[in-house]
Regions:
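Intrinsically disordered, low-complexity regions enriched in serine/threonine
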Residues: 46-230
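Residues at beta-strand starts and edge strands
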Residues: 12, 35-37, 55
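Beta-rich nucleic-acid/ligand-interaction surfaces
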Residues: 26-47
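Amphipathic alpha-helical segments
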Residues: 2-26
């Protein structure tokens, strides 16, 4: 049973790093405080979303003293933006970990990391990104509504930053909007806001609309659902 949150998230990070490096991957970003851990990694394989525009697949991890979220991750090399594909079938949300000993769920955590690293998972993400390059972004979808659904604070300020970035993009496609959102995420200092923006970027690329996360910390399972925004 977990009694020390930072020791717990440190153990999670060590296991995550081990699984990633075993697969010749690299941890590219880690943020840890007394109660939270955010980590992102990339695998060595590269695919092009457009000529000369390369993507790498990987895994994004978020952990608290009682929960772990694992999602496929897409990293765009040219601008060093990342998108979290929280809608992916291989995403995992492990709960009630503070009521268990670490070794009781270690194998489940390793399997979840391995699943997110699978080649077919990255291939699916690349198809979603390529499709996004061919679809004009309909701003009537109401980006402010999407931001609100993502559970983000200061949505009006974020909206202004995203729109400024979007109109600098060479094409006003769904891919361009994804890049605008993830560019703002990249430059955001708050790790939770950055995570949620990267989730939103992944959702836009895949043409889905996230519902807000549950505000009830006692919920046993994530209540996130997705509907098409195509």
């Amino acid at each position: 049973m977990n009694k020390q949150p930072r020791a717990f998230t440190s153990a999670i990070l060590e296991l995550f790093s081990e699984e990633i490096t075993t697969r010749s991957g690299t941890l590219i970003d880690t943020i840890q405080d007394d109660t939270r851990l955010f980590a992102r990694s990339v695998m060595p394989g590269v695919r092009e979303v457009q000529p000369g525009d390369k993507l790498q697949g990987g895994v994004a991890l978020r952990a608290t003293e009682s929960e772990v979220w694992l999602h496929p991750y897409v990293f765009r090399q040219v601008c060093r933006n990342g998108a979290i594909m929280a809608h992916a079938l291989r995403s995992q949300h492990l709960t009630d970990l503070d009521l268990q000993d670490f070794w009781d769920f270690e194998s489940v955590l390793r399997e979840a990391i391995q699943a997110c690293c699978a080649d077919e998972v990255f291939a699916t993400s690349v198809r979603e990104f390529r499709s996004a390059t061919e679809v004009q972004a309909d701003l009537a979808l109401n980006l402010l509504s999407l931001l609100s659904r993502s559970g983000l604070q200061n949505t009006s300020g974020l909206l202004g930053q995203i729109m400024d970035q979007f109109f600098r993009e060479p094409a006003q496609t769904r891919f361009g909007l994804t890049n605008a959102v993830t560019a703002v995420a990249r430059d955001t200092r708050d790790p939770d806001t950055r995570w949620r923006l990267e989730e939103l970027g992944g959702a836009i690329a895949a043409s889905i609309k996230p519902t807000p996360p549950s505000l009830n910390p006692g919920m046993k399972k994530a209540r996130r659902q997705f509907v098409s925004i195509a």
